Amino acid sequence: MSYKMSRAAYANMFGPTVGDKVRLADTELFIEVEKDFTTYGEEVKFGGGKVIRDGMGQSQVSREGGAVDTVITNALIVDHWGIVKADIGLKDGRIAAIGKAGNPDTQPGVNIIVGPGTEAIAGEGKIVTAGGMDSHIHFICPQQIEEALMSGLTCMLGGGTGPAHGTLATTCTPGPWHIARMIEAADAFPMNLAFAGKGNASLPGALVEMVLGGATSLKLHEDWGTTPGAIDCCLSVADEYDVQVMIHTDTLNESGFVEDTIAAIKGRTIHAFHTEGAGGGHAPDIIKICGQPNVIPSSTNPTRPYTQNTLAEHLDMLMVCHHLSPSIPEDIAFAESRIRKETIAAEDILHDIGAFSIISSDSQAMGRVGEVAIRTWQTADKMKRQRGRLKEETGDNDNFRVRRYVAKYTINPAIAHGLSHEIGSLEVGKRADLVIWNPAFFGVKPDMVLLGGTIAAAPMGDPNASIPTPQPVHYRPMFGAYGRSRTNSSVTFVSQASLDAGLAGRLGVAKELVAVQNTRGGIGKASMIHNSLTPHIEVDPETYEVRADGVLLTCEPATVLPMAQRYFLF
């Protein structure tokens, strides 16, 4: 005779199941479990008196015989493809299976074999997401990487060489010598890393040199001169060598207007950074570019979401980042031309309708590297409060909105930059770069961060205590962040052309070098999952009002946000 449990008792023991709802942090976002892969009555759970014991939920199968290295039990998966409850099996640093774990000798429907060589991570009552990707990094200081890891990021893409003034302003690692030094430095960090070369040139030779030196992408930045000639040259090299191009356009409209930039792009795929414009770009109407089918638009997190303090902090931030002087009137005018409440408010709505595809940081260069997830979910919460349910929702939940927003910092940047064959989603065969969250701290403070199936970071109590929980509890690197485990648990992405040219042998780095792929004509705005809308955008040159397909886009600034001071008292 089967034993019946109440929903509350079941959720307390094994986590939520189909029909149960979970609140994300202190937001107004509620997700509902769409599917549960378990067999009721056959759930596996680790602990004293629990199921994963020899002859019960643990089989006699060896690793060679098919048992996984790690099982995450009864996890609530939140990804672009769905919100489901499942066990997750990890093997060889990758996601081996999603489904039902246990002992096939004693349990039905098992597709994840637990054996004597299997470690267990308790996922009951936890949320698991793919590791986040930040595709707009100024590599100003190496300490950013630890900050990013502890926030739930597992991949960082961008450019720089340290606190040089070129790096303070632009996401470029200029030249093959600097790129080589950065690839060598990558061995020191538990993080998947990728470096962008400088894309500003009117002749291809120096750009080709950087791609062959390991650049995964090329960055066009106005501070180096983003002219129509440079745009055309850079995209031509990218098309030949299969690397992405990111663009920060000409705020001052010196070499042309947004229409001239669109013409120079010639319909080729390009990733437009901070497409709203506060981070830089044709003033006041660069935001129009988000309606182009070949343009992948993204935001940086200082404008996410629009609040009563957004405008005030931007002026000083901009003056510092772009080497401007408050004593020069032209510099002040340059800065003020980029900061417009109307376009920032419209940016909120364009994210909510899926017209902006990616959210990133702009680390230490008008952006906060540890707040990519926080700012994403604050935007989602603000839009739910102001705009209500999305028309795409099918139940009494926010599942579609959550899937849309999680895609903005996981799968979509991975697709845009040719990394989605390795990272960006929680799918079988991809790298086991995972983040485990307590729902009450979702998006704010992870419970655990895995890189290549190895625990790289987690909050940890006093190491001298008798148990792991006594205060002070703070984030610490774990074993995956040390020694050869570090270099075997993460990778450095490079161009295929650089690998073909023998880069790995020349540099002799410890980390695996993995090539980016499919960054050009095979992708575009339509490839951005849940974020592919291409509305016709108009900007009033006098009032800066933004319209999408004729509809005015405006919203009030937030005065209070979730995931803020309540979580950072200490």
From Swiss-Prot:
SUPFAM superfamilies xrefs: Composite domain of metallo-dependent hydrolases (SSF51338), Metallo-dependent hydrolases (SSF51556)
Residues that bear N6-carboxylysine: 219
Keyword presence, Ligase: no
Domain Urease as annotated: residue spans: 131-570
CDD domains the UniProt entry points to: Urease_alpha (cd00375)
Gene Ontology annotations of biological process type: urea catabolic process
Binding-site residues, Ni(2+) 1: 136, 138, 219, 362
The protein's enzyme class: hydrolase
Pathway named in the protein's UniProt entry: Nitrogen metabolism; urea degradation; CO(2) and NH(3) from urea (urease route): step 1/1
Top-rank taxon, per record: Bacteria
InterPro entries in alphabetical order: Amidohydro-rel (IPR006680), Metal-dep_hydrolase_composite (IPR011059), Metal_Hydrolase (IPR032466), Urease_alpha_N_dom (IPR011612), Urease_alpha_subunit (IPR050112), Urease_AS (IPR017950), Urease_asu (IPR005848), Urease_asu_c (IPR017951)
Subunit composition and interactions: Heterotrimer of UreA (gamma), UreB (beta) and UreC (alpha) subunits. Three heterotrimers associate to form the active enzyme.
Homology family: Belongs to the metallo-dependent hydrolases superfamily. Urease alpha subunit family.
PANTHER family per the UniProt record, alphabetical: UREASE (PTHR43440:SF1)
Protein name: Urease subunit alpha
Gene name for this UniProt entry: ureC
